[in-house]
Amino acid sequence: MLQVQEKAGSVFFSIKAQPRSSKSMITGEYDGSIKVNLKAPPVDGEANLECCRLLARTLGVARSSVEIVSGTRGKMKRVKVFGLSAVEFTEKITPYLYSSP
């Protein structure tokens, strides 16, 4: 089950990123985290930027509302999205976690 924490008007959750994929997309859930394939390589923060763009587009929030708070140099990342409650976040992300690509 996806682990989401709500604090001070923001939600926090984990991402497992797979850079250099053929397509940028949310592919499901992995051990309480959101599994994300990213087309960008893990060079000069390109994959992190692509991850934030993908999440902002998927959740319908501004790119500036999405921030990687830890794990910028690894596959496992902790992400903060400002302006969503845990309920809103779960409603928006669930269709992407449990649908076929």
Curated annotation (Swiss-Prot):
What name has this protein been given in UniProt?
A: UPF0235 protein Cphamn1_2066
Give the similarity note. Answer: Belongs to the UPF0235 family.
Q: Name one GO cellular component term.
A: cytoplasm
Superkingdom as given in the UniProt entry: Bacteria
The UniProt entry, under InterPro entries, shows: DUF167, YggU-like_sf
Q: HAMAP family of this UniProt entry?
A: UPF0235
